[in-house]
Amino acid sequence: MKMIAWMQHFLETDETKLIYWLTFLMVCMVVDTVLGVLFAKLNPNIKFSSFKIKTGVLIKVSEMILALLAIPFAVPFPAGLPLLYTVYTALCVSEIYSIFGHLRLVDDKSDFLEILENFFKRTSGKNKEEK
């Protein structure tokens, strides 16, 4: 019984629950990055690109910074904590879906980076034609 009471002590306040959500999100991000790099290196059909790795890490770091910066803005408001839990849950589900995509448990055919690259190529091509 002492052990259960000790474990419940960690979930008494909302701040500790937020820390656990952030920790879970960070673990999911690390697992997703490691699996992505590992499978890209081991699979000869996938082109290993340092640009994609840097972009992925940059996206994860920016998501974590935004998740941390949202805490001081959300806590003072009554609807802030449920909204923050919703955002953290959505980020965790997104990371878990990405992990499942690496493990080929879900069919994820979208290549967001390719869409962005094509968009920037088209916009930069228009700017060159106008000059």
Swiss-Prot record:
InterPro entries found in the cross-reference section: Phage_holin_4_1
Location (main, coarse): host cell
Localization (cell): Host cell inner membrane
Keyword Membrane listed: yes
Domain of life the protein comes from: Viruses
Keywords, alphabetical: Cytolysis, Host cell inner membrane, Host cell lysis by virus, Host cell membrane, Host membrane, Late protein, Membrane, Transmembrane, Transmembrane helix, Viral release from host cell
Pfam families in the record: Phage_holin_4_1 (PF05105)
Record's bilayer topology term: Multi-pass membrane protein
Membrane spanning residue stretches: 53-75, 79-101
GO BP of this protein: viral release from host cell by cytolysis
Keyword Transmembrane helix among record annotations: yes
One GO cellular component term noted in the UniProt record for this chain: host cell plasma membrane
Cytoplasmic side: 1-52, 102-131
Family: Belongs to the bacteriophage holin family. phi29likevirus holin subfamily.
Comment block on domains: Isoform Holin has 3 transmembrane regions whereas isoform Antiholin lacks the first transmembrane region.
Annotated protein name in UniProt: Antiholin
Organism: Bacillus phage phi29 (Bacteriophage phi-29)
